[in-house]
Amino acid sequence: MTLPLLGPMSLSGFEHSWFFLFIFIVFGLAAFYVMMQVARQRRMLRFANMELLESVAPNRPVQWRHVPAILLMLALLLFTIAMAGPTNDVRIPRNRAVVMLVIDVSQSMRATDVEPNRMAAAQEAAKQFAGELTPGINLGLIAYAGTATVLVSPTTNRYATKNALDKLQFADRTATGEAIFTALQAIATVGAVIGGGEMPPPARIVLFSDGKETMPTNPDNPKGAYTAARTAKDQGVPISTISFGTVYGFVEINGQRQPVPVDDETMKKVAQLSGGNSYNAATLAELKAVYASLQQQIGYETIKGDASAGWLRLGVLVLALAALTALLINRRLPT
């Protein structure tokens, strides 16, 4: 949790848990304080004239006298928690990752069930995704229909990606498997030259399509989409699929209306086989929401961060309160 002014506070993930042994010292101090109070009470009872004692003793509630000491012990406990080094989950922008944006440009993308058409909506949402993706991520772009073409190799230059998105052209047929294999090759190539760690950079494929694979017709073919998805899983590259459109989509081909309903099932299967997630969108607003969700997943990583500062600040405040109450109640600091 995070408290205003104090910052993140956690009671888990302690890096120096042996500091909790200091609690025994705090308990020892508390026991010593109790013993001192008992001894003090006994000394007071030695006065023969109790009426005289009551007349000269400060007229303050006895129970309030112990508040400063209690606050002091509480401050020591808070300092103990801080020294034990609690941690919490912190989301930070990735500065070493590869994302391949793979977009279907087959003729079915002419369908106007999504205004103004599927392609134009895809371009607008993809450009927004590219613009909002964290700067350190290398983003590449592949367009595919009957063949797959790397339009932009993975780069942090978002202008190149947006410019290429504006120039997408329609083409015949749909080779989803080839597009995935092409993306994997691009990821492997850039992963070999990106430094910053012993392991290859984390990678993700974002596959955008609206229809079934037509080359080959069997997705389990050696060059099919399912085979490519299994290969992606073996290489540790999950595929996030976005199926875009409605079941009412159609295009005009040679003067005839050809239905092009969105194919959610194939995309879900590709995501499942690769270890990724599947999404579907039927409007531009839904598509932008999907991309926003992906941006949060892809653009950030969760690490363990220090959460001791909040406990330290709280301990200082309680310690200051102990000193203040000691001066107000007992007219001296607690002993």
Swiss-Prot record:
Q: Which keywords has UniProt assigned to this entry? A: Cell membrane, Membrane, Transmembrane, Transmembrane helix
Q: Give the chief site where it resides.
A: membrane
Per the UniProt record, one Pfam family is VWA_2
Question: Does Membrane show up as a keyword for this record?
Answer: yes
- Domain VWFA intervals: 98-294
Look up the domain of life of the source: Bacteria
Query: How is it placed in the membrane, per its record?
Result: Multi-pass membrane protein
Record field: transmembrane:
18-38, 67-87, 133-153, 309-329
- Cellular localisation: Cell membrane
Q: Which GO cellular component term is one of those annotated?
A: plasma membrane
Member of which family? Belongs to the UPF0353 family.
Xref: HAMAP family: UPF0353
Q: Know the name of this protein?
A: UPF0353 protein ML1808
Identify the species of origin.
Answer: Mycobacterium leprae (strain TN)
Lineage start: Bacteria, Bacillati, Actinomycetota, Actinomycetes, Mycobacteriales
